Amino acid sequence: CFYTWETRTRTVDIENGDGAVTSTVEEYTVAVPVSLYQAYANLEAELGRTITEDDKSNINHIYSMIAGAAGGGNYNGEFLRGDGSSIDLDISAFTDPNSKNAADLVTYAIHAWESGWGYVWGTYGDVLTESLFAYKLEQYPDGVGSYEDFIRANWLGGRTTDCVGLIKGYGWLSPETMTIDYGTHGMPDIGANQMYYSATESGTIDTMPDIPGLAVWHDGHIGVYIGGGQVIEAMGTKYGVVKTELAGRGWTHWLKIPYINYD
């Protein structure tokens, strides 16, 4: 009910026994969330009846677990917005632009915060153009459409992301072109919960080691721990990318993000 499958291609570098590297193009399949309205229609077709408001409530809950919470809810605790407005991507402080590592994930997240990135469900760091905004309105008529006026007034023309998109955007960033290329560099397109459940190293928040670049998670939401008891997170449509304190934010678990090097 919630996904459609798409076949895409990617370039993979393979190191041969003699140390030479060759590139090959391979096909891969990704699961892409359908729009919320399409999920309603799919369930009606599956059940053979008109769905009820209770059905829709259940779908909304499952959908947010898959794709992340759309508006981010309300938060009354302290948070700090970055004061920048740049759309430039800056990797000058990366330790190793050619690998996907925890230190550079932290640098990337801090850059997104300092640059004042906004929040739009289903985005991952690209500039929110009129055409991209129109596509997201069609794709997520509730999750994005409900905030259309706010997004247009506050985020249009700047870079935007959602919570897990902040991590995926780093994974998909190609340093040679300085573009965020969907589904590349071994980072799949997965939601916050899928990222948590696919981790091989994780634990409850009270067991969290002090390692910058870990992700912190609760059901439907994920952020990047940057050290010093602080987190960068794409909090929600009305907040954008913000800095918060780790303690008291409701995080339940930590994880080493799959596809990120922590050595």
Describe the function of each predicted region.
Residues 29-31, 216, 254:
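Short beta-strand element of the conserved SAM-dependent methyltransferase core
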Residues 25-26, 206-210, 248-249:
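Short, surface-exposed loop and linker segments with low hydrophobicity and enrichment for Pro/Ser/Thr
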Residues 72-176, 219-221, 232-234:
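N-terminal capping segments
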Residues 1-96:
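Membrane-proximal envelope biogenesis segments
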Residues 249-263:
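Low-complexity, Gly/Ser/Thr/Pro-rich intrinsically disordered linker/tail segments
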Residues 94-106, 115, 156-158, 168, ...:
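...with weaker cross-activation on analogous glycine-rich loops/strands in unrelated enzymes
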Residues 15-17, 46, 65-71, 75, ...:
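Intrinsically disordered, low-complexity segments enriched in small/polar residues
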Residues 33-44, 52, 160-166, 201, ...:
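Extended, compositionally biased low-complexity polar/Lys-Gly-rich tracts
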